[in-house]
């Protein structure tokens, strides 16, 4: 059977999800080996340096949406690149939170207007988009950063991980 007859698991996210030629190893590529290729086709569309915002604004989500079909899955993990200034030489940060807040900017990178959303709002766009195609969205909280306090790894359970959990719950995603 062709891969089109099988369900497809699309993985979207940043460098923590995708291996790079620079020696970085994300969890998405090794995950592929855990699935039976006779039953499901896995496509890792994650790319280093991307945030939930830039995955959308660069057209990467549209490229996934163009191929989604009923029975597919979208596994998403963002957050590592969603912090920082909204309008710098990368224009990749999202607004903090999970609410409906927006901020209109003229991007320094190209002078174009953009309405920046909250982190949770971008995730909800991915979730509702996947569901509109009959696919199952799966939200994964970001892997912990290499930040230690008192001998323990720091958690983002009051920021991006929390907002991911809230967005998934709001839209009944896994």
Q: What residue spans do the PLM features occupy?
A:
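Serine-esterase "nucleophile elbow" of acetyl-processing enzymes
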Residues: 1-47, 62-74, 90-102, 168
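Short glycine-rich, polar/acidic loop-and-turn segments at beta strand-coil junctions
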Residues: 46-49, 80-82
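Structural motif
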Residues: 51-59
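Alpha-helical cap/lid subdomain in secreted, periplasmic
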Residues: 60-174
């Amino acid at each position: 059977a062709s891969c089109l007859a099988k369900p497809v698991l699309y993985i979207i996210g940043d460098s923590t999800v995708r291996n790079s030629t620079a020696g970085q190893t994300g969890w998405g590529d090794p995950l592929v080996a855990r699935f039976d290729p006779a039953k499901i086709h896995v496509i890792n569309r994650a790319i280093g340096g991307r945030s939930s915002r830039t995955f959308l604004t660069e057209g990467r989500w549209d490229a996934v949406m163009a191929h989604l079909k009923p029975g597919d899955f979208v596994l998403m993990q963002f957050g590592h690149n969603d912090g920082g200034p909204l309008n710098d030489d990368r224009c990749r940060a999202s607004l903090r939170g999970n609410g409906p807040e927006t901020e209109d900017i003229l991007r320094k990178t190209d002078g174009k207007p953009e309405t920046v959303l909250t982190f949770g709002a971008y995730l909800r766009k991915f979730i509702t988009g996947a569901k509109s195609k009959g696919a199952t969205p799966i939200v994964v909280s970001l892997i912990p950063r290499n930040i230690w306090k008192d001998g323990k790894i720091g958690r983002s359970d009051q920021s991006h991980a929390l907002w991911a959990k809230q967005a998934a719950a709001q839209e009944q995603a896994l």
